[in-house]
Amino acid sequence: MNETMICAVGNVATTPVFRDLANGPSVRFRLAVTARYWDREKNAWTDGHTNFFTVWANRQLATNASGSLAVGDPVVVQGRLKVRTDVREGQSRTSADIDAVAIGHDLARGTAAFRRTARTEASTSPPRPEPNWEVPAGGTPGEPVPEQRPDPVPVG
């Protein structure tokens, strides 16, 4: 399937609106993306045009974004670009939306402290042993190998 995937770097422009819908959590917010360029005449960085996107996130990404983002936060958003045109009150309007697959704080402009979320669903499959991708003598690549630990060294 051909989709337009983009990565937008900007600032959260509106308070994220969280909704718990029948098919799972959803959040939306506006993202302001302003081009900056070096103005040689002024010898300074200058703001260019600002584009606004409505960012949509679903499921766990929605829950985490809602609890992590605030107006003004610098963020990086990756997702599918959707340009929509509709008619409201007799006027044709165009909007650019991003269906987000990843959202994060822009660490080029600040720091963050990451916290993992607790898993809400129990895993239905038993854990599988990690395959050893190095081939043991006489073995086959990709087969799990029993864990090999060195013999303990006596102390003292």
Swiss-Prot record:
Q: Which CDD domains match?
A: SSB_OBF (cd04496)
The keyword DNA-binding belongs to this UniProt entry's keyword annotation: yes
GO biological process, any: DNA replication
Q: Where is this region: Disordered?
A: 114-156
All residue ranges annotated as the SSB domain in the record: 1-107
Low complexity bias spans = 114-124
Q: Does the keyword DNA-binding apply?
A: yes
Q: Which UniProt keywords apply?
A: DNA-binding
Q: Which GO terms describe its molecular function?
A: enzyme activator activity; single-stranded DNA binding
Q: Which domain of life is it from?
A: Bacteria
Q: Known Pfam families for this protein? A: SSB (PF00436)
Provide the disulphide bond pattern. none
Name a single GO cellular component. nucleoid
* HAMAP family assigned: SSB
Note the subunit structure. Answer: Homotetramer.
Question: This protein is called what?
Answer: Single-stranded DNA-binding protein 1
**Which organism is the protein's source?**
Streptomyces coelicolor (strain ATCC BAA-471 / A3(2) / M145)
- Gene designation: ssb1
